[in-house]
Amino acid sequence: DSASFYSLTTKPIDGLTLAASFYEKNDYDNGTDDSGDQGEEGGAYAAKYSMGNLTVGYGKSFKAPESTVITAGGTTVEYYENTGMSIAYAVNDDLSVSYTNEDSEVNYQTSTTVGYDIEMDSIQIAYSLGGATLSIARTDYENIGYAQDADATDTIIAMTFAF
């Protein structure tokens, strides 16, 4: 097996970062004709812009898992499509708040299988106390595992120390 990875990151103007990537896995382990198979590959692109205390970001990624039978149907995944957006604001040197929204869509090969998008919304707050940072994140998930009404909520409180 082998894999090829390509990526490009550029900062064309002050505050703007653009990135793109692609990977492809070459699978040689079974010794048979793989010409009809779907090989694993994926890619992503993203943009981030910072101006003063405000930062916004947007990204999209795709992943096609390896599949040995293109017309399997049923629940054989053709590809996943993920989209993320975020905004962060540094209120001052010690306090920052941010919001993130992510969506993941599953696409099946040749079936009528219904896939429900996974959706995630998260709010984060961090406060610096000199050598320590206290942070809290509240995240709501919908349709975990691409299953309808499989929802959850997480709250994470963390304290990190610099030594």
Question: Over which residues does each language-model region extend?
Answer:
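Outer-membrane beta-barrel proteins
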Residues: 1-163
